[in-house]
Every structure is written in structure tokens, then in C-alpha cells.
């Protein structure tokens, strides 16, 4: 499940990306933060597993730069989400091979961090 970021986001608006993003609050685990933001952004809860982490740095067109430790959390959910329009403009189901082809053909449609996440996750799976 991919989401398209809302038009009013301060960076990377209207770009396609991972299902949700979060930063843990004080005393909150990475998985707890992921569950919280999944509910806030996509309107559902599911069990999540932390499968890997990595550090990335990416500059944005608005002069900001992100330099973060990212965790990739995986969960399973088969129903349509109830998106928060302040966070999400649209969503879609996508197969990994279709994502790979679309990123190759249209990298400008995806967030910088998602392109890194997708590549790292495929490497981990051995694709």
C-alpha cells in the first residue's frame, strides 16, 4: 500500500511514498510509533514488525535536508484505508515489480526516502 502525500505537506507534497512515516515520541518504541501514525494517517491498525534500519540523507527542493535513521516496519492489511486528508491525498495497492518499474520510469513521482527504502528492502529480500 502506497500513499500520495497531501498537497499541503511542507516538503515532498503530492509524491508517492511508503504507507506512513513517524518519529517516536519520548518513551515510545519504533513499532508503537508506527502503529500510532498508521492509525492517524491511514485510519487502521495492524501488527507491525521492524525488519531493518538504515541511515539516509536527502536534500529537498525547498532547501531542507533530512538526515535520519529509518526503520522499515512491515504489516499486513487488506481493507481500504480511511485516509486523513491532512496527511494523504490518495492511496493505492501496488506490487513490488510494478513499483520498481514505475520508479525507474518516473522517479520524480516518488519521495527520496521511499526510493531508498524500496531499494534497501529489495536488497534484503534478495531481489
Task: Label each PLM-derived region with a short phrase.
Residues 14-16, 20, 54-60, 64-127:
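Nudix hydrolase/Nudix homology domain
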Residues 44-54:
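A short coil-to-beta-strand element that immediately follows conserved catalytic motifs
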Residues 28, 40-41, 68, 87:
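Acidic-residue sensor for enzyme active/binding pockets
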Residues 3-7, 11, 46, 64, ...:
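N-proximal short alpha-helices
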Residues 1-36, 40, 105:
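Conserved Nudix-box catalytic region and its N-terminal flanking loop in Nudix hydrolases
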Residues 42-43, 77:
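A broad structural signal for alpha-helix termini and local helix breaks/kinks
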Amino acid at each position: 500500500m502506497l500513499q500520495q502525500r497531501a498537497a499541503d505537506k511542507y516538503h515532498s507534497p503530492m509524491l508517492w511514498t511508503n504507507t506512513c512515516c513517524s518519529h517516536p515520541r519520548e518513551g515510545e518504541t519504533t513499532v508503537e510509533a508506527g502503529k500510532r501514525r498508521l492509525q492517524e494517517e491511514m485510519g487502521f491498525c495492524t501488527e507491525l514488525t521492524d525488519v531493518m534500519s538504515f541511515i539516509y540523507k536527502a536534500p529537498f527542493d525547498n532547501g531542507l535536508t533530512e538526515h535520519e535513521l529509518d526503520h522499515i516496519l512491515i504489516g499486513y492489511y487488506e481493507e481500504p484505508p480511511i485516509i486523513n486528508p491532512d496527511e494523504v491525498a490518495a492511496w493505492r495497492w501496488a506490487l513490488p515489480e510494478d513499483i520498481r518499474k514505475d520508479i525507474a520510469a518516473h522517479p520524480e513521482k516518488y519521495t527520496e526516502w521511499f526510493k531508498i527504502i524500496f531499494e534497501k528492502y529489495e536488497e534484503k529480500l534478495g531481489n
